[in-house]
Amino acid sequence: FWDIGFCTGSVSVEAKLQFPHLRITAFEKRPEGVGILSDNCRKFGTPGITAVTGDFMEVELHEYPTPDAVFIGGHGGRLVDILRKIDACLPPGCPIVFNSVSAASREMFKEGIRTIGRNVKETVCMTVDAHSPIEIIKAE
């Protein structure tokens, strides 16, 4: 499992809680994210998450286990480039999941998915209040 743009590591930690056997590689541009992830791993008892810091576009992905699924939480405005990069090393049918908080990022993801020849399979909208809808989009 790859968590791209992990921020606080909440998705990685939850994935590890749900599936303790899962090999998780979490990528984050900001160095301070590693400390936050480490604290959250200790707090929730989820050791074994590999944190990788730096610009994702410069990471040598072949150095990490091929994922069964990918979650993109942060993209720094380079979502389509990230999709192209991961598509080159993902197995066929590997799910790519993205959380979108804006119409612009939702459309950017959908366009990127089309660009790499994959299809959106499912969209779930979560709304806490009228001002904070989040769409979770799954593509394969």
Located regions from the model:
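Active-site capping/gating segments
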Residues: A103-E140
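The conserved SAM/SAH-binding core of class I Rossmann-like methyltransferase domains
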Residues: W2, T25-E28, N99
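S-adenosyl-L-methionine
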Residues: F27-P67
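A short glycine-rich, Lys/Arg-flanked "PGG" loop and its adjoining helix->strand segment in the class I
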Residues: D81-P95
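Conserved beta-strand signature within the Rossmann-like core of class I S-adenosyl-L-methionine
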Residues: G93-V101, S105
